């Protein structure tokens, strides 16, 4: 793996203060509410001039991290105040994440690179694990292992210091990753609709054909016993670790489901789709909440770790932060 020296690339970008730009989109009332769920808009702002591909709450729930199509990662307060930007990655940036120990930020590049940053915005190092675009990068629960996946079909596992542990080659573009909450497995999904469960040593433990076409994201349930996938066929699917389908959620008749997330307390799940709508579902498939949000694609969702807030993003660069109660 090519690792670039830190001293050649270190620069500080944080402690930037900017006026909040409020998006001029009015949030309508939910058209379905069978559960008593309440989403009250806390903050709405413009996070980018282009599509925001992913948003994540920090592990402590105090910050938001966005990855945008222009190759810029941005750290925000929950109130929409920009703390700083991570620039220089070749666009588009498909994902950016914070390590569970809240010490490191990781961003992905279209040129096969990932960059590791500290919270002061200083670039610690740049690594090139792939020769094609890096679609996702994720930390293990103890923050010591990094996993990447790429357009080259490879999922790579290596130490925080850059030493490769394993490389798993599969057909099709590897699209998104999830780490088991106890670190037991890595889930890797692809444009071909396959879901692979890989152990930390790189052995494929199970391959699941989802029938969803390109899979946009994958998540483990909070207890680690189930998996959730979202696809371009308009569905989200719930699986057990044996690869058995528990339920299919037919979210939209046309268009993509771009994000499907477990509620942190495990009672239900949420989807965001091309029709600009947030939906909550019981695990048995009952639609319990539906909120039309915007006349644009919703690209990503993220629950705060305590489940009290939900963040959403759009293809127009908008960010919403809701307070959630039920």
Swiss-Prot record:
InterPro entries linked: Apc4-like_WD40_dom, WD40/YVTN_repeat-like_dom_sf, WD40_repeat_CS, WD40_repeat_dom_sf, WD40_rpt
Keyword Nucleotide-binding: no
Start and stop residues of the WD repeats: 47-77, 88-118, 129-159, 169-199, 210-240, 252-282
Repeat recorded as keyword: yes
Pfam family, one: WD40
Example of a GO cellular component annotation carried by this entry: outer membrane-bounded periplasmic space
Key words of the record: Repeat, WD repeat
Protein name (Swiss-Prot/TrEMBL): WD repeat-containing protein slr1409
Organism the protein comes from: Synechocystis sp. (strain ATCC 27184 / PCC 6803 / Kazusa)
